[in-house]
């Protein structure tokens, strides 16, 4: 009978995987660049509590060794025990499946609605920011506001586990910190990087602020900005503005 001997006293399943994350570099070629998909994977790995390394990739001069590693691939991608994985959605599924309890946190939301909350915002924002026709601006801004309002309503609506059926108190507003509760989930890793871009870019190029009356969104963003998993994986506001300097169209008659 063949026995699989543990290496260095560790069983195979107890060994830490070797993970390297490759993300888009900023304008200086070294710092974290503007890429919500890069930040999404960065946040997932950080929240999982797994040991991993991060390499920023300067797209202007992609190193030869990187082209050999993942030819024709733009970041983000990962290597997991030297195996290259390039599809962001599949990487998310893979990490959730492989880095699982009890050793690692489960990050899937409990409530399916959390996965789709805010999903239309980025498309409406893109149409708004790329438009150059003044006569179309108001309607596009209304479209963006409508999707933000929908997210705000979701964040302010109590989740089932916030409502105590035995309590006499009628809870009308949620006080949760994130989409699915008081802890970040995969849904937040997807939405927060995009929502931050909307906030920064719309202010810079359209002087548009997310209305202060949208208390759910502002509570959500404030809680995100207090977490290292978000702020330390986030590009600087300047990087976000630079990334959109050619994308954001001036309103010209």
Swiss-Prot record:
Reaction equations catalysed: chloride(in) = chloride(out); thiocyanate(in) = thiocyanate(out); nitrate(in) = nitrate(out); iodide(out) = iodide(in)
GO cellular component: apical part of cell; cell surface; cell-cell junction; centrosome; chloride channel complex; cytoplasm; cytoplasmic vesicle membrane; cytosol
Chain ranges for the short sequence motif G-site as given in the UniProt record: 35-38
Major site of localization recorded for this protein: cytoplasm
N6-acetyllysine: residues carrying this PTM: 24, 130
Region (Required for insertion into the membrane): 2-101
EC annotation from Swiss-Prot or TrEMBL: 1.8.-.-
UniProt keywords, alphabetically: Acetylation, Cell junction, Cell membrane, Chloride, Chloride channel, Cytoplasm, Cytoplasmic vesicle, Cytoskeleton, Ion channel, Ion transport, Membrane, Mitochondrion, Nucleus, Oxidoreductase, Phosphoprotein, Transmembrane, Transmembrane helix, Transport, Voltage-gated channel
UniProt entry tagged with the keyword Oxidoreductase: yes
Modified residues (Phosphoserine): 4, 132, 167, 236
GST C-terminal domain location: 81-244
Modified residues annotated as N-acetylalanine in this record: 2
Keyword field contains Transcription regulation: no
Gene Ontology process terms (BP): angiogenesis; branching morphogenesis of an epithelial tube; cellular response to calcium ion; chloride transport; endothelial cell morphogenesis; fertilization; keratinocyte differentiation; multicellular organism growth
UniProt subcellular location: Cytoplasm, Cytoskeleton, Microtubule organizing center, Centrosome; Cytoplasmic vesicle membrane; Nucleus; Cell membrane
Membrane topology label: Single-pass membrane protein
Role according to the record: In the soluble state, catalyzes glutaredoxin-like thiol disulfide exchange reactions with reduced glutathione as electron donor. Can insert into membranes and form voltage-dependent multi-ion conductive channels. Membrane insertion seems to be redox-regulated and may occur only under oxidizing conditions. Has alternate cellular functions like a potential role in angiogenesis or in maintaining apical-basolateral membrane polarity during mitosis and cytokinesis. Could also promote endothelial cell proliferation and regulate endothelial morphogenesis (tubulogenesis).
UniProt domain comment: The active G-site contains a monothiol Cys-X-X-Ser motif which mediates glutathione-dependent redox catalysis. Members of this family may change from a globular, soluble state to a state where the N-terminal domain is inserted into the membrane and functions as a chloride channel. The redox status of the active cysteine in Cys-X-X-Cys/Ser motif likely determines the capacity to adopt a soluble or membrane-inserted state. A conformation change of the N-terminal domain is thought to expose hydrophobic surfaces that trigger membrane insertion.
Family per record: Belongs to the chloride channel CLIC family.
Name recorded for this polypeptide: Chloride intracellular channel protein 4
Annotated source species: Bos taurus (Bovine)
Gene behind this protein: CLIC4
């Amino acid at each position: 009978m063949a026995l699989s001997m543990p290496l260095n006293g560790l069983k195979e399943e107890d060994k830490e995987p070797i993970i390297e994350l490759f993300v888009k570099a900023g304008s200086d070629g070294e710092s974290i660049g503007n890429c919500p998909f890069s930040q999404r994977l960065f946040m997932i790995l950080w929240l999982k509590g797994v040991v991993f390394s991060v390499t920023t990739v300067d797209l202007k001069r992609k190193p030869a060794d990187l082209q050999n590693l993942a030819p024709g691939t733009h970041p983000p991608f990962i290597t997991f025990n030297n195996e290259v994985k390039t599809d962001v959605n599949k990487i998310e599924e893979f990490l959730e499946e492989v880095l699982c309890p009890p050793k690692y946190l489960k990050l899937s939301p409990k409530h399916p609605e959390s996965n789709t909350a805010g999903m239309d915002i980025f498309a409406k924002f893109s149409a708004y920011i790329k438009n150059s026709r003044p006569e179309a601006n108001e309607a596009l801004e209304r479209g963006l506001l409508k999707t933000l309002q929908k997210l705000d309503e979701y964040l302010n609506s109590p989740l089932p586990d916030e409502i105590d059926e035995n309590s006499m108190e009628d809870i009308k507003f949620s006080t949760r910190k994130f989409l699915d509760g008081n802890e970040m989930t995969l849904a937040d890793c997807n939405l927060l990087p995009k929502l931050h871009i909307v906030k920064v870019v719309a202010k810079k190029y359209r002087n548009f602020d997310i209305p202060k009356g949208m208390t759910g969104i502002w509570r959500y963003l404030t809680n995100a900005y207090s977490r290292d998993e978000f702020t330390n994986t986030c590009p600087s506001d300047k990087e976000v503005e630079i990334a959109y300097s050619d994308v954001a169209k001036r309103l010209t008659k």
